[in-house]
């Protein structure tokens, strides 16, 4: 397993904001202690050409220059352009590592799956997973599948990749919940809205059905928007998954013979480090 991490990604914060540095700070020592053989790499920043595959130049410039918050959830932190480019770069590098035969996980912030082509929102500035997907298609992959099991709909990813015949996207998310999208499926987009409080077993079944549908696409690469906010103890939604359920998601990845990389999205409970570890350990049980 290769973990992509830039330690500077913990340098920004807002008082009381759930997308806080501790999400990473507490996960790093736990993973390093339990998995001493895993490789840790610092990512590079995504460049303009890579960002422009998913975003308009106006959006890229706005992220770099604005001093006003993008919305109530998405502050204009000092240097957020720098941190967001590193997070996008980590997703790109993780996808490329997967195409090279490695298992790879981007342990970075900010997350990305709510960022649309022209808008930062929902704690997200650049669409990391979409940027990585489009980069992969430019660098050897012919078909890429995206499996998003974050508790919130990946609306930004959907907007950017919709109707691209070389991409299949599936999102399993609570509904109703932020951002209020993802109710219908179309073209290359499969949405799986689940009700608040859905029994664990039913939620897991939906996630597996979504993954199996993606595998029918016969992708050269599977990218995972790994959000851990469907956990029963997460403060932002009302879902029911437990630690062992995230292990099940990882076990499924372990069993498929497709290059795979995952990117951290949400997850705001104090148990996030344990949830990440359960998922990664099941995905790479030899470590």
PLM feature spans:
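Conserved alpha-helical scaffold segments that buttress catalytic/binding sites
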Residues: 14, 92, 96, 106-255, ...
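Short acidic/histidine-rich active-site segments
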Residues: 258-266
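Conserved beta-strand segments of alpha/beta enzyme cores
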Residues: 37-39, 168, 259
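Short, electropositive alpha-helical surface patch
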Residues: 56-62, 242-243, 272-287
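Small/polar loops that bind or transfer phosphate-bearing groups
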Residues: 43, 149, 264
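Metal-dependent C-N hydrolase catalytic cores
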Residues: 1-133, 142, 193
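Divalent-metal (often Zn2+) His-rich catalytic cores of metallo-beta-lactamase-fold enzymes
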Residues: 229-230, 267-271
């Amino acid at each position: 397993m290769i973990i992509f991490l830039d330690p500077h990604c913990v340098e920004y914060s807002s008082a009381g904001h759930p997308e806080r540095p501790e999400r990473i700070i507490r996960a790093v020592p736990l993973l390093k202690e339990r998995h001493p053989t895993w490789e840790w790499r610092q990512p590079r920043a995504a460049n303009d050409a890579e960002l422009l595959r998913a975003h308009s130049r106006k959006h890229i410039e706005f992220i770099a220059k604005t001093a006003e918050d993008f919305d109530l959830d998405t502050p204009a932190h000092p240097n957020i352009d720098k941190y967001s480019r590193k997070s996008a770069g980590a997703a790109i590098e993780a996808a490329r590592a997967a195409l090279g035969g490695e298992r790879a996980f981007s342990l970075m912030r900010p997350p990305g799956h709510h960022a649309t082509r022209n808008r930062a929102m929902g704690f997200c500035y650049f669409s990391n997973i979409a940027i990585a997907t489009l980069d992969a298609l430019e660098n050897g992959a012919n078909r890429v599948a995206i499996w998003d099991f974050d508790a919130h709909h990946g609306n930004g990813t959907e907007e950017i990749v919709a109707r691209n015949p070389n991409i299949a996207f599936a999102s399993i998310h609570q509904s109703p919940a932020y951002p209020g999208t993802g109710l219908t499926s179309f073209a290359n987009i499969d949405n799986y809205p689940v009700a608040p409080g859905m029994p664990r077993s039913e939620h897991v079944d939906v996630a597996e059905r979504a993954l199996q549908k993606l595998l029918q696409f016969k992708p050269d690469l599977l990218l995972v928007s790994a959000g851990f906010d469907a956990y029963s103890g997460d403060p932002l939604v009302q879902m029911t998954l437990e630690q062992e359920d995230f292990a099940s998601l990882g076990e499924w990845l372990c069993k498929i013979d497709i290059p795979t990389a995952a990117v951290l999205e949400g997850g705001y409970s104090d148990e996030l480090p344990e949830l990440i570890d359960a998922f990664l350990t099941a995905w790479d049980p030899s470590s």
